[in-house]
Amino acid sequence: MSNSKDEVERIDWLEAELADTIDEDYELELSEPTLSEKIREIYRKAHPPALPRMDYFRALLALQAELIKLQDWVVYHKQKVVVIFEGRDAAGKGGVIKRITQRLNPRIVRTVALPAPSDREKTQWYFQRYVPHLPAGGEIVLFDRSWYNRCGVERVMGFATEEEVEQFFDDVPEFERMLVRSGVRLVKYWFSITDEEQQLRFLTRIHDPLKQWKLSPMDLQSRVRWEAYTKAKEETFARTNIREAPWHIVEANDKKRARLNCIDHLLKQIPYEDVPHEDITLPERIFNPNYERKVLPPELYVPAKY
C-alpha cells in the first residue's frame, strides 16, 4: 500500500531533506511541490529518523566551538594540518568542509579545490601542483579532492594510463610518509553514499536552479561508471591505507549526521588543547574637537532597498 508506514517514513524523510536544503544557506525560500513529486517517484530507500533540526544545530555549534580551539592550538604551536576529503560526486564533501570552515579564520584554514591540470601541469611530476598548497606552520588545509584524483576520476575516465596509475600507487605511500615525517598531520576521509542516494541528490540538483551549477558532465558520467568507480575505490583503500595516514570512511547517506560524525572524528585525531590568550581591552575612542566630518555625496551610498 502506498500509505504504508515505510512509505510515510520515506515521505517524511524526503520533506525533511528538502527543508534542509533551505536551512543550508539560511537565505533560500523555495516552494517547489513538483520537485518532491519527481524525486519521490524514484526514491525507494528508507532512511533513519531525521535528526531534529535544533539538535543538529546545537551539536554543530558545540563542534564548531571545538574547531576554534583546534585552530588556536594549531597557530600557537605552529602545527601543520592537512585534511583530505574524497568520495563519489554528491557525497557531501563540500557540505562538511563548509561547516568546518564556517566560523574559522580563512587566513589560517583554507580550502583547496584544484581544477583539471593545465597542459603544462600535465608534464610535471604528478604531485607538483599540490605541493604549493601544503600548509606552513600554523595553518590547516582542507583538500576538496586531492592527489587521489589520479586513481579515481582520472583512471575511470581514461585521463591517466594504467602505467601512470601504477606509478601513483607506488609513489603515494612514500609521498605521504614524507609529509608526515616533515611534521604534517595528515587525515584522509572517504564519504560513502549509496547508488540510490547519489541518484536522489543528482535529481535534486537537476531540478533546483540554485544547484544546477554543481552538476557537471563528469558527474553524469559517474552514474554510468558506478562500478568502475567502486573498483577504483577498493584498490585505492587496499594500496594506500598506510599506518602513517589511514583512511577513514564516513557513512554519508544522512548529510547532517555525516557532518557531525566527521567533525567529531577529526577533532579526535589531533591532540589539541586550550592555549593561553592575552586579555583584550577595547581602547577608548579619541575625540578631536576640531574635526569636522565631511558630508559625502548621496550617490556614494548603496540604495537602502530593504
UniProtKB/Swiss-Prot annotation:
Under the heading InterPro entries, the entry gives:
P-loop_NTPase, Polyphosphate_phosphotransfera, PPK2-related, PPK2_PA0141
> Looking at its record, which EC class is this enzyme?
transferase
In terms of Gene3D superfamilies, this protein maps to: P-loop containing nucleotide triphosphate hydrolases
Catalysed reaction(s)? [phosphate](n) + ATP = [phosphate](n+1) + ADP; [phosphate](n) + GTP = [phosphate](n+1) + GDP
Q: One Pfam family, short name please?
A: PPK2
Q: Is Transferase one of the keywords?
A: yes
Q: Which GO terms describe its biological process?
A: ATP biosynthetic process
Q: What is its EC number?
A: 2.7.4.-
Could you tell me one molecular function GO term of this UniProt entry? polyphosphate kinase activity
Ordered alphabetically, the record's keywords are: ATP synthesis, Kinase, Plasmid, Transferase
Its domain of life? Bacteria
- Its family? Belongs to the polyphosphate kinase 2 (PPK2) family. Class I subfamily.
This molecule's function is given as: Uses inorganic polyphosphate (polyP) as a donor to convert ADP to ATP. Can also convert GDP to GTP, with lower efficiency.
**What name appears for this protein in its UniProt entry?**
ADP-polyphosphate phosphotransferase 2
